[in-house]
């Protein structure tokens, strides 16, 4: 199954078990199934300024924000089909979470503001269901795969890194028009822009210059792509996972067994 991952403005959602949400037609909830350390939730239905502690078995829905503390981590599930792990100091926003039944996820849109996530997405119907993840630099599309995504916005050089452990992810700096761009597989030729895109940097109103080059990459098993400022590809290719925290690539903890 194809998986759609949107990387362009990612914020993290953490929910408290004691928090109740009123669900409209089709809205579904996710749940916190593992927690080590601190997890905070900012509920869309209450004040947007106050973070509240979230615990194991807390639920969340669209519009919520989740944030892990220092030396903390959490695992979320969505309709028992997909799971998302949050590394320490990660913030995720749940922008949209819609289902057609108790165990049927139809649409999920998440945004990673800062930090790192690992996710395994299952149970989506090709051409019907949508799972998107975005950061401030790019967007990706997914269906039936395992991947990790990190976003670093602090400092002079913002960066988004996508790693695919198995399956296939399509990522673009113009996720709203993926179906119009010519795709290039990582490890092949460099990313291409759409035939209709404007060549080279273009001056626009204001003090800065922007590039209108647009690209779409296909990232497969054990490949990664790093995106820098302006949505430009910094590097792409295979990666060595020996330094990756085993839990952030799908391994179980002793307490999980």
Where are these regions (language model features)?
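Short N-terminal segments immediately surrounding and downstream of signal-peptide cleavage
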Residues: 24-40
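Small-residue helix/turn framework positions
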Residues: 130, 136-139
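C-terminal interaction modules
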Residues: 2-9, 17-29, 50-56, 69, ...
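Short beta-strand segments and strand-loop junctions that repeat across beta-rich extracellular domains
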Residues: 36-52
């Amino acid at each position: 199954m194809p998986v759609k991952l949107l990387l362009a403005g990612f914020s993290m959602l953490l929910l408290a078990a004691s928090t109740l949400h009123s669900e409209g037609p089709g809205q579904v909830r996710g749940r916190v199934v593992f927690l080590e350390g601190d997890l905070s939730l900012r509920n869309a239905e209450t004040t947007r300024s106050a973070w509240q502690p979230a615990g194991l078995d807390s639920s969340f829905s669209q519009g919520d924000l989740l944030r892990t503390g220092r030396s903390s981590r959490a695992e979320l599930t969505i309709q028992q089909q997909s799971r998302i792990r949050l590394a320490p100091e990660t913030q995720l926003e749940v922008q949209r979470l819609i289902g057609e039944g108790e165990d049927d996820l139809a649409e999920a849109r998440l945004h990673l503001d800062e930090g790192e996530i690992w996710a395994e997405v299952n149970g989506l119907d090709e051409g019907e269901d949508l799972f998107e993840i975005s950061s401030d630099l790019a967007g990706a599309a997914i269906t039936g795969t395992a991947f990790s995504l990190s976003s670093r916005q602090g400092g002079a050089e913002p960066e988004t890194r996508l790693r695919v452990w198995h399956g296939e992810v399509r990522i673009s700096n113009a996720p709203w028009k993926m179906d119009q761009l010519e795709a290039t597989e990582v490890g092949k030729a460099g990313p291409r822009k759409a035939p209709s895109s404007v060549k080279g940097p273009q001056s626009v109103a204001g003090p800065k210059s922007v590039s209108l080059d647009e690209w779409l990459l296909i990232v497969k098993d054990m490949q990664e792509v790093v995106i820098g400022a302006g949505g430009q590809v910094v590097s792409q290719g295979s990666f060595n996972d020996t330094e990756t925290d085993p839990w952030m690539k799908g391994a179980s903890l002793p307490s999980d067994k």
